[in-house]
Amino acid sequence: MSGHSKWANIKHRKAAADAKKGKLFSQLSKEIIIAAKHGGGNPETNPRLRAAIERAREANMPKENIEKAIMRGTGEIPGVAYEEVTYEGYGPGGVAIMVEVVTDNKNRTAAEIRRIFTKHGGNLGEAGCVAWIFEEKGSIIIEKESVKDEDQLISDALEAGAEDVQISDDTVEVITSPESFSEVRDILKEKGYKITQAEVTKVPKNLVPVDGPDAEKVLKLMEELEDHDDVQKTYANFDIPDEILQSLS
């Protein structure tokens, strides 16, 4: 789980920059549109929409933007016809990578994602080539300053139904099953922990050690994928030493 936590922390630090560029709101809006399109506009009966709205609120997305995104998803107001696509491939050092996108032009996006992989020494593969390496888990990122007692947090999280707790220098990640994710998140929030990010994500079952030049190439590949306008989420199974990770990120 450590490799996942490292990448989760890097992405968490990038969130402020993404917000400044406006990409964060665009990502959140697309997720709400897709969730409403497939499950309806009522968050009480659509767990995916409820989670997307929670993320949007945590990012201080205006209420009007959220409501418009829901209506675009349900077709109440006109909007771009988006669809979800997942791309899979390998990066330098044999790192498995999954990329989830929301696009209005699959052909354009596929060509651009392939170019990014190739540019950084990776290759885009067929559907299913790396999906088996990952499993769905709930990920709850907590601001470490809001944690007064780490042992108490671990106890609270496990009692709420969490599977694991990963503690790093500046954040804490609580791992749950997809089924218990919402309940654990709500309980921890009620107990006063400051949750900065919460989502159902994909966690690698095994990690690939990456060092030296390959580590730099992998991070540049991941960062360019993250910066692409159509990309919603990225997942990878690299394990890069902390000292290299800090110097490159």
UniProtKB/Swiss-Prot annotation:
Keywords: Cytoplasm, DNA-binding, Transcription, Transcription regulation. InterPro entries: Integrase-like_N, TACO1_YebC-like_2nd/3rd_dom, TACO1_YebC_N, Transcrip_reg_TACO1-like, Transcrip_reg_TACO1-like_dom3, YebC-like. GO terms for molecular function: DNA binding. It comes from the Bacteria. It is found in: Cytoplasm. One of its GO terms (biological process) is regulation of DNA-templated transcription. GO terms for cellular component: cytosol. Pfam families: TACO1_YebC_N, Transcrip_reg. The keyword Transport does not apply. Coiled coil: none annotated. Its main location: cytoplasm. NCBIfam families: PRK00110.1, PRK12378.1, YebC/PmpR family DNA-binding transcriptional regulator. Belongs to the TACO1 family. PANTHER family: TRANSCRIPTIONAL REGULATORY PROTEIN YEBC-RELATED, TRANSLATIONAL ACTIVATOR OF CYTOCHROME C OXIDASE 1. This is Probable transcriptional regulatory protein Dtur_1615. It comes from Dictyoglomus turgidum (strain DSM 6724 / Z-1310).
